[in-house]
Structure formats: C-alpha cells, structure tokens
Amino acid sequence: MSFFPPQQQQTPQPLFQTQQTSLFQPQQTNSIFSQSQPQQTNSIFSQSQPQQTNSIFSQPQQQQQTSLFQPQQFQQQQQQLNQQQQQQVQQQLYLFTNDKAPANYSTKWADLHPDSQKLLLQIEEKILEHRSESQRLDQCSRLYDSSVSSEGFEFDASRIVQELGGINTAMDRQKAVLHELMIVAKDMLRNAEIAVRSFMMLQPRFPHWKQGGGVVSVGSQPSQGQGTNPAPASSGQQQAVTTTVQVSDFYRGIPKKPTAFLLQTVVRFEKYLNECRQWVEELEQLLALDSDKYSRHASLLESLPKVMSNVHDFFVHVAAKVESIHQYIESMRTSYLADQRRRGECHDPFLEADRRETAKQEAAAKRVHPTLHLPASTTSTQPSTQVAGLIASSATPGGSNPPQTSVPTSNPSSGAGFSFLNTPASGPSSSLFATPSSTAPTSSLFGPSPTPTQTPLFGSSPASTFGSTQSLFGQTTPSLTMPSQFGGATPGSGASFGSMTKSSRPKSRTTRR
C-alpha cells in the first residue's frame, strides 16, 4: 500500500541512480521505516525538505512524487531495475531482500534481509529515543520557570549596577574637579582683565624717561630730543596710534570696586571667623561640663538619704525574690519527698544533709582561734569615732569588704557575727535594717527584734564617752557606754558597716571557714 495519492502517468524512474541521495548520509535526514506485521506491507516515509520532497526512489529534481505500486507499471519497473543493476558497478545496497535484491515500498518485512531488518530496528530505536527526550524536554518545568534564568541574571545585573554606580561616582568627582578648575580659570581671567585695565589707565600718569631724553607713553609717539623738530608721522604710524587709542578707550572708565580679590578675601575671612566661632562654642560646652562635674560633688551629700532609701527598697525587693525562691524550693522538696514515699523510699536526704551541716558548724565552733590569748583591753582602750551608715564603711580601708555569712565564734565575747539569711551564729549579731536585740542570739535580715530598745540606723545615735557626736541625719545624744569592738555591736554605732578603729581590723577574732 502507498501513503501517497497516485499522480499523473509518468515514465517510471529507476530506483537507484548514481546522483541519487543516499538514505544514510550524514548530511540529510534519513527516512523513517515503520515495522508492520508480516502480512502487511512496510512503507517508507520520506521527510520533506524546505523546497522539494525527495523520496528514496525518486530523482532530486522532481517536485512531484511518483507512485511505484501501480500494477500496469510493475513489469517495466522490473526491466529497468535489471538494466540499472547492470549499469551500476559495485554499488552498495543498505536495504535489500533475502535474494540480494534492492528493497522497495512493496517489500514485506519478512522478505527483508536480517541485516536490513537490524538496520531499520536501530533507526527506529534512535527515533523513539530522541522522541522521548523531546517529550521530556517539553514537559520539563524549568524551561518555563523564569526564576532559573533570573538567578544568574540578577547577580549579573547587581554587579553591573554596582559598576555603574562606581562609574557615576567617579564622573561626579571629576565633574566637581572640573567645576572648581572652571571657577579658578574664570577668576584668573577676570583678575587679568582688571590688571590690564588698571595698567592701561595708570600708565599715562607715570611716563618713563628714556636715555635720549624722550618720553614714552601710551597713545603718543616718542618725543625727540631737545632742540630738534618732530618728524612728520607716516600713515602707518597714525593707524597704530588710532588702534592704541581705541584699545585704551575700551579699558577706560571707573574700575570695578570692590575688586574680585577683595571680595574673595572678605569671604575667606568670614569663613575663618565662623570656624573660630565653632571652636569657641565647643570650648564653652567643655567648660560647662567641667563646671557641672565640680558642682555635682556638692549635691552628693544631699542626695545620700534618697540613695539609701533606694538601696533599702532594692534590698527588700531582693529579699522578696529570695523568699519566693525559698518557698518554691520548699514546695519542690515536699513534692520530691512525697514522690519518694510513693515509690517506697522512706529515707530523707535533706535531713541527712542538715545533720552533716550541723556537725560541720559544731566542729568549726570548737576550733580555737589563734588570737584568743591576746588581751581584749589593747583594742578597747582606744576611742573610736563612729559615723552611721555607709560613710563609716567608705572611710575605713576594710569597710568595703562584705560581711561573712554564717560565721560561728567560740566565745560570745569574741565578736559579733552577722547573719544574712537566717543563718545561726553562736555569738550575738546585729541586724542591717531592723532593730536588733541585745540578748537575742540571732537576728534575721529584715525580721523584728524582741526588745526594740535601739534607735534606727539614721535616727538619733549615742555617741562616745568623751562627748556628744552629732549624727548625720538625726540629733545628738550623749553616750552612756564606750563601744568595744569585741564586746558586741553598740546600738546606732554603724557596726554593721564597719568601724573607724585602725587596729580593729588586723585583730579580729572572727573565724574563717
């Protein structure tokens, strides 16, 4: 069967010619052979060229295709085929039958030679492979995705924009330089014009005497010596004189005042004055800051009560936080013990830890301090000047040291231990912001005292035995007893923050853990 309609009757052309285009040349597209069933006729499809449709068995010059399968022309085709085989010598055949005869459109698949069948199958595999690749390329989304191509494009575009920005900046810089040069050139031209104008106006007023006695001036001829007659001037000399007069008339008149030089000088002087003014303002600001710094020291003493109040509020806030933490820890301890009891474990690890801590404190209290054998009168005989509050602690060299927490002592008279957070001490201790009791063994940080017999920290404080010392924030009261550092804290003496005694620091009997 044929896939081409029968055309007009023409003379059958030979199947193979010398000038015929081969089927498997690399310069042209090969024809497609489709495999059919053994009972069907295999057809050969020729690919159309841009200007003409060349079949395998037709001449390239023909523009019409000739049907080779008409019954009345079959015998003539066989005769011409035999003639063509005789004419062609050693012609290579790619598609041939089992009888070594050339294949045509009417040749069946079973009649083809195995080599020809293998060649056709290879061609079909290549066609199917390229067809599947083209279909995958058509279905690939990256071909239609603009972001794939825009990534490199955006990078190149940003780089080009940066380069253009740099070029633009360089051009602006060069433009500024050229503008400055243009201004300088204009100033030079104007100054040169003013200089020439001034020269043309002032030269006639200052004649120059030559050696021969003649006078030379602009607009006049050189005069002759005394006693001689002037020679008549020629026409060329008269024309030169006229030109000189015209040029001098161009520069005559009232000169421009003030001159450009004076204007530039005034502008430059004004600019310098503005810079000096800025310097003066900066110096005044620095001096004002220094004066404020010196005046600030005077107000520090007045702001001390407010500072102490803020410190007290902060301590209260911290104590509240610590109390909340203690409550949370206690709740966690209770829940942990309940969980342990639920699991069948009855021992209390917290109780064992408390017992070990108590044993450590008792062992530390039994230790003998190496300075206990020293007499206590060597340090208590010296009078000490006490100032309440943080002033006492800031005045002493060792006042800045924080109080040691939970310091046990072997003797109640050896020193006053300071308890920060409910830590017991063996000796009497003083409270920081509350009124401590003189007989209570321990006192908390913000807890009340059983015997409120002492004045507050910033109230009226007792003074020393030798006289009355005025308090910083209260009134003066006479002292009844002389304070001793090793006999306990004197009420209102600022023992919580330190003492002014020089020899009290190196001879402290508090034990160190």
Curated annotation (Swiss-Prot):
Bias type Polar residues, positions: 30-50, 393-427, 452-484
Basic residues: compositionally biased ranges: 504-513
Major localization listed first in the record, in broad terms: nucleus
GO molecular function, one term: structural constituent of nuclear pore
UniProt xrefs under InterPro entries: NUP58/p45/49
Keyword Protein biosynthesis: no
GO cellular component: nuclear envelope; nuclear pore
Name of the protein in question: Nuclear pore complex protein NUP58
Organism: Arabidopsis thaliana (Mouse-ear cress)
